[in-house]
């Protein structure tokens, strides 16, 4: 259910805007059934990735600070995760895989690039912010997980010849 809850109006607005911008074209291309499967695989892959990264980070913290965890003073594994952003990032990479040369233009700053380059930039930014811990409160590895699972599913469908069959 985490994919249907959001942290506020702007979180919901930007996810729905991206869902409309990129998801509608993706759905028209692969069909509604595959699109629904794609959306949930990317979303569930996002939370799986986020949970695994958090688990391993917790393990590293436990080794460094074993006394903190044993006394129950901290419990990071109960950090809530919410939003459809992981699935949305999966949709963005799916769109970029099917339409790599489409041009995306940002409003601020006014930059135009091909979809494949925007997605690559998103990956680098999410990886950097996730590893360095900048922009706290954002599940960067969930975004990357959504992209990874979306990429792998679309790659599987392409290679198996199932992408274009509705």
Where are these regions (language model features)?
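A detector for small-residue-rich transmembrane helices and their helix-helix packing motifs
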Residues: 1-166
């Amino acid at each position: 259910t985490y994919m249907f809850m959001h942290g506020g109006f702007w979180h919901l607005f930007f996810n729905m805007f991206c869902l409309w911008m990129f998801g509608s074209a993706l759905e028209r291309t692969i069909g509604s059934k595959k699109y629904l499967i794609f959306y949930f695989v990317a979303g569930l892959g996002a939370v799986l990735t986020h949970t695994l990264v958090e688990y391993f980070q917790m393990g590293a913290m436990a080794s460094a600070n074993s006394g903190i965890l044993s006394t129950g003073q901290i419990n990071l594994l109960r950090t809530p995760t919410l939003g459809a952003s992981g699935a949305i990032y999966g949709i963005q990479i799916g769109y970029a895989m099917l339409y790599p040369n489409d041009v995306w233009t940002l409003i601020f700053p006014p930059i135009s690039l091909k979809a494949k380059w925007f997605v690559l930039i998103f990956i680098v930014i999410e990886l950097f912010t996730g590893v360095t811990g900048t922009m706290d409160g954002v599940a960067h590895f969930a975004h990357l997980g959504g992209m990874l699972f979306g990429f792998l599913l679309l790659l599987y469908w392409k290679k198996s010849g199932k992408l274009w069959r509705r």
